[in-house]
């Protein structure tokens, strides 16, 4: 989206966010996989403004590097302005303007870093409305049934915007007003600069309010315009953990609905959480209790869940993933994972492969058609195509100093309870017996067996645990066995 004339956007993110009661700066709290500030900057970037400035104050040392990272991600310049003291929103805008070129003469859009649902379309409509009029400012408004904490819109009898009164300074009758300031404005920069120098701190909070610019411009006879939006969630701010949870749920509801409309079956939207950067293919079914996080990508015709959490996982088409926790892994087409499977970073499961119940994998490649059906740890390993790893096997990858790799060839069959002591290689087509500890390479086609013949120590329990329940049971069994042997030896 681009507009005639120049556009600069100031994002106010200098406040301490004390009501969050958090060591994390408010604008860095996350919703749907992005920080609130990241949501704002993603939306603004779609407008392609000539200038984008983030105004920082509290904890600016922590936030500024993340702004730089977002600038790289979004492939655009984002300037940072510093508000050295918390003197109010009017002062924050004054600081933000200092980051613009002295000869900049376009419009200035002001928004905040704690309205994560504010989208590019809403901003674009505000700018278009402002460009179509001769107003000095166009303010975005909305209506809340409970407008606690929001500045109220005061209108004349002709329904023109007269002023904005902050909640703390509002009279009881003014607090009954339900139309509120959304905290988003489009200003003529000349009018804005002229009004900012007239601000004073004669208010309850002793701050320079940006909202006072409205009444100043009005008194000067300049036109003040307003644009009302019905969808108040788009401009709802976050000041505490309750509001954070409420907006998280609302954004998730919208994300889920978007996927449903696009052809994804989501059995229970109320228990399904999907981050904003997740993609899901057509005809995939998402079962209850599923979380798809980060940049997870799900192909077409997959079955995911129930009770599954995937973070930055790539799932190819027609795969099934049940009751699985996975991070930074890849699941091939037609593969089957779960239940109760743990995919740690670096896991790559090939086409039609299988990772079954109580299997944990890490930094390993499991080839096409290979199977690890149950009760196994696979760490730092490469398993060839169509191999089968027996139950209770362990890839012993740590030698006390560093992680070592194990290589399993194709079409290998390993017995239950096999231990692979890395570094070790098992050749194509080889077998291992149950309980084998593989310490040396196994040639292709060989059978590896390391278990010695079984040795039974007769009457050990009676001697070592005399009088115990086990000894008594053994004695009875021996007596029965003796009688049966005697009966067999007697002639008919």
UniProtKB/Swiss-Prot annotation:
Q: What Gene Ontology terms for biological process does this UniProt record contain?
A: cell morphogenesis; cell wall organization; lipid A biosynthetic process; peptidoglycan biosynthetic process; regulation of cell shape; UDP-N-acetylglucosamine biosynthetic process
> Region (Disordered): which ranges?
461-492
Residues annotated as binding Mg(2+) are 114, 239
Cite the cofactor comment: Binds 1 Mg(2+) ion per subunit.
Segment N-acetyltransferase: which positions? Answer: 263-492
Where do the annotations place acetyl-CoA binding?
391, 397-398, 416, 434
Gene Ontology MF term list: glucosamine-1-phosphate N-acetyltransferase activity; magnesium ion binding; UDP-N-acetylglucosamine diphosphorylase activity
Q: Which cofactor does it need?
A: Mg(2+)
Q: What is its EC number?
A: 2.7.7.23, 2.3.1.157
The UniProt keyword set, sorted, is: Acyltransferase, Cell shape, Cell wall biogenesis/degradation, Cytoplasm, Magnesium, Metal-binding, Multifunctional enzyme, Nucleotidyltransferase, Peptidoglycan synthesis, Repeat, Transferase
Q: Which cysteines are joined by disulfide bonds?
A: none
Q: Which family does it belong to?
A: In the N-terminal section; belongs to the N-acetylglucosamine-1-phosphate uridyltransferase family.
Recorded protein name is Bifunctional protein GlmU
